Design a protein with these regions (language model features):
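Boundary/junction segments of secreted and surface-exposed precursor proteins
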Residues: 1-24, 231-239, 243
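Cysteine-nucleophile protease catalytic domains, especially the papain-like/related folds used
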Residues: 8-125
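Short linear interaction motifs
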Residues: 25-32, 36, 123-127, 136-146, ...
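Short, flexible loop/turn elements at secondary-structure junctions
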Residues: 26, 46-49, 145-149, 164-169, ...
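Active-site-proximal structural scaffolding
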Residues: 38, 124, 136, 155-158, ...
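Active-site-adjacent substructure of cysteine-protease-like catalytic cores
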Residues: 120-176
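Cys-His-centered catalytic/binding microenvironment captured across papain-like cysteine peptidases
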Residues: 153-157, 166-231
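Lectin-like carbohydrate-binding module/patch detector with strong preference for beta-trefoil
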Residues: 227-402
Length: 402
């Protein structure tokens, strides 16, 4: 039997489905100097790689929020649960035995010496076989990519997920398929020819070498298994789950009244960090608008909480429990205080991927949330209010659509 010349292996990891739709454009504030200047570092690549692999191994889709939700920054802010998770998992990636190679390899040459193999041979003789064995066993791996040549440049190294490979034994060329969170939504390859000491990435980078990182999976937070297509139109008669853009939590209500001073005692409305049927709202048209009418910037709707049958409501002069802004509650009977005007970025039709405000028609206050909670007054969940001004905490997007 002739020797097989071209050898391939791959795992069913798809960067489009299992990666994130926004780039690794995070800026981390490490220190604030006495003069107010901020010391920053760039990126959370290891956290994004670890979290993406967490979702894949759990058999769950990664959250598919798009970069334009957080324009102009293009990434979830630090108030968002996903951004905080990236930070936690980035730290996890550094507190592994293999992470020391980011430092040691950055201080070694590409070529072998009397004592050490060097980065080229370490990669091709030790780490590449580990990648191949893992992929052949059906398991993607986190790779540490090394470009630095001194300690001062260690921060330029990178972390990705390897999920496929191809080896041409005749030419000596090896290609590794990776999810690179600097290039969202597309496959990236690392290629090295037989006599080549480094690895050329299809997205323009050149890496000295790579190693397999130690990784322990963590159960991911799953808010939906049925994310809509971002282009799906939203209409009256639809049932939605709405996600708060700046924190990632879900608009929620439960059969429990407000009890704080000055309240009207109606049903609490909060933002919830999990996912259940108490997050589902029916969009109902006003003024005889028929079900199935496409909604757009300027449309007015009412939101009926499906679990309790009550209506999203607000009223002037009633304080919210924690911030003292205008209270948002759910009431038995709808009237003009249950009317909400839709404001869509760029005055477009309302689609599932759009960033929208819901503005209370009677008071012109925007549906709003922020990271304030109380175990008694909001059941430990995030306060939802109607805010008379406008800021980033007023934005919402569709998490589920049915």
């Amino acid at each position: 039997m002739p020797e097989q010349v071209l050898i391939r292996g791959a795992v069913a990891f798809d960067p489009e489905a299992h990666g994130f739709a926004f780039p690794n454009a995070f800026v981390n504030e490490v220190l604030t100097l006495p003069n107010g200047a901020k010391i920053t570092t760039a990126g959370r690549c290891g956290g994004m790689a670890y979290v993406s692999l967490d979702y894949f191994l759990a058999g769950q889709p990664a959250p598919r929020w798009r970069a334009d939700l957080w324009a102009p920054s293009r990434v979830p802010p630090d108030s968002h649960w996903l951004a905080r998770l990236f930070t936690q998992r980035l730290r996890d990636s550094f507190f592994t035995g293999s992470a020391a190679k980011f430092v040691t390899w950055s201080m070694h040459s590409d070529d072998e010496t009397w004592v050490f193999k060097g980065v080229r041979r370490w990669t091709k003789e030790e780490e590449l076989p580990r990648v191949i064995r893992s992929i052949d066993a059906g398991r993607p791996v986190v790779l540490g990519l090394v470009v630095a040549r001194d300690l001062a440049s260690v921060g330029h190294n990178h972390q990705v997920i390897a999920y496929g490979y191809e080896q041409d034994r005749e030419s000596g060329r090896t290609t590794v398929q990776v999810y690179d969170n600097n290039s969202p939504g597309r496959a990236v390859t690392l290629t090295s020819e037989q006599g080549q000491s480094d690895w050329t990435a299809s997205n323009g980078h050149v890496w000295r070498g790579f190693f397999v990182q130690d990784y322990t999976p963590r159960r991911p937070r799953v808010l939906t298994r049925n994310a809509p297509d971002v282009k799906d139109r939203v209409s009256t008669g639809d049932t939605v789950k709405l996600s708060h853009v700046w924190t990632g939590l879900t608009l929620h209500s439960h059969d429990r009244p407000y009890t704080h001073r000055g309240t009207d005692g109606h049903q609490q409305v909060t933002c919830f960090g999990g996912s259940d049927d108490n997050d589902r709202w029916l969009l109902v048209g006003t003024g005889g608008t028929a079900a199935g009418t496409a909604l757009r910037d300027g449309s007015v709707v009412r939101l009926r909480h499906l679990s309790t049958g009550r209506w999203l409501h607000s009223a002037a002069g009633v304080p919210s429990p924690l911030s003292g802004q205008q209270e948002v509650s759910a009431v038995d009977t709808p009237d003009a205080t249950a009317d909400w005007r839709i404001e869509v970025v760029d005055e477009r039709p309302w689609t599932a991927g759009a960033r929208v405000r819901l503005v209370h028609v009677a008071t012109d206050a925007a549906l709003h949330s922020h990271r304030a909670t109380d175990p008694r007054l909001t059941a430990g969940q995030q306060e939802v209010t109607a805010y008379p001004g406008r800021d980033v905490n007023d934005w919402w997007t569709v998490l589920e659509l049915s």
